[in-house]
Amino acid sequence: MSRIRLPLILSGALLAIQLVASAYQAPVKVNRGEYFPARDNWERRKPADVGMDAAKLHAAVEFMKSHETAAPARDFSDQEIIFGKLLGSIPAERGATNGLIIRQGYIVAEFGDTERPDPTYSVAKSMLSTVAGIALDRGLIPNLDDPIANVVEDGGYDSPHNRLVTWRHHLQQESEWEGEMWGKNANFLGKEAFGGAEMKPRPIQAPGSFYEYNDVRINRFALSLLRLFKKPIPDVFRDEVMNPIGASTTWKWVPNPVKASGEW
């Protein structure tokens, strides 16, 4: 297995989580009634009101504030070194360390600018798997073990090898799909294209037999879902998931303006 991209995370986040966990005390009975946070009105509580130790919670927050990650760089100057040739736009800089601690639906701690939108890379995989679930529920995907070539006819699954790729393979990152997306090959070879994430040559395995964390194949999966819905996947996610659950409206999926060989 190989991992080629890590999401934006706080350095030392695991230790911080341990600190927060240690701040938890015995449950305190609170007469909360029926409560579900509104989109822009999450209620706040003191740590003691939800069974947390205020001093330990404060220590956890201070730890996180003082352990900002060094990667990516604030100005994203290291992105091509890490990931290779960039596709699409990227902000001039990222925000500083920030976060929320929520218990029982209430905000008990907040630090930094939590309303600033910042790039979050691998969250796309969770988004796409959710959209795939909607497609399955609607019957757009009859069966997760069906070959994608049965319903997607854009040339991306025409080869004998790719015709074996199923929806489950993409969802489990075991597709071994062969091809290019926006000028980047799924084999992840080449320093210019992939930077420090480039891989060593290896034999391609049968779909479903080898796991690989591979962004090119995730992009192919996203395009295949678009073919089913016949509209941008971010629109599907907004209309079917984010708006119904009352999520914030500040998020966005930044489109890729690059036109290159391999764009089906």
State where each predicted segment sits.
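Conserved catalytic neighborhood of penicillin-recognizing serine enzymes
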Residues: G155-K184, M199-S209, V216-N219
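N-terminal leader/targeting segments and the immediately adjacent pre-domain N-terminus
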Residues: R5-L8, A13-D113, R138-P142
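Active-site SXXK
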Residues: D53, G105, P119-L144, H170, ...
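Active-site helix/loop module of the DD-peptidase/beta-lactamase fold
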Residues: R138-E176, F229-W264
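Short, charged, amphipathic alpha-helices and their helix-cap/turn boundaries
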Residues: G99, Y106-I107, A149-N150, Q173, ...
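Flexible glycine/proline-enriched surface loops and loop-helix/loop-strand junctions
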Residues: W42-E43, P201-P207, R217-N219, P255-E263
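Solvent-exposed loop/turn segments at secondary-structure junctions
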Residues: Y106-V108, T114-E115, W177-E178, I218, ...
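Catalytic tyrosine of NAD(P)H-dependent dehydrogenase/reductases that use a Tyr as the general acid/base
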Residues: Y121, Y211-Y213
